[in-house]
């Protein structure tokens, strides 16, 4: 009995540790915001395209789908582990038919004779139950259930990581488009200056040195565009991977950084925010 009681203590839920934390601090900058951030935080940027990508990633992302499959697998294993705590019932039924050379014979239980044919029916049922004296089966069930719960927190971690990756890739796309537009305007401006200097050189009032310097500036401006286009394509491909679509089917309008709303970030986030982190909840 002592060993059995010890096993029960190991599977009991541990109480939350009581910490002597002051309610207020001397260096507090003011009353903190008690409201927790919204779970759909991306809506604060007021971008319809970003919202669509976020919602699509939550339903079709392959990493999230794999995490959900692991949850289903863990639930099935937990059900299998729980079956050991239930009685085991088995039943059998068999029948046979034979033909005899005569119509005479003995009729016994489970058999019948008719016109030289003998039919036998045999049915049996048995039940067994394993007494979980040391708590092995129940501990196995609890371990399987905790594994399933841990997989649910892992799924939340994957979802948060995926959503953060979608947001970062989309903002990189918008930033790359903005930089390409700026570089295009710089090229046009450098081209106009180059044409003006060349016109003065042709008229004999300009310097060949000024023309060569401006030609170098124009070449540098043009050379800055291909890396920006490559970065734009790479981030667009990242978005396509995150939403499980071919890159050719991803059409991004992007826009400009100036058109994106900046959510208000309040100082003094509540410490309860840490309890929403799935990695911390998994360890607990």
PLM region descriptions:
Residues 1-59, 106, 145, 229-275:
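Terminal intrinsically disordered/low-complexity segments used for targeting and assembly
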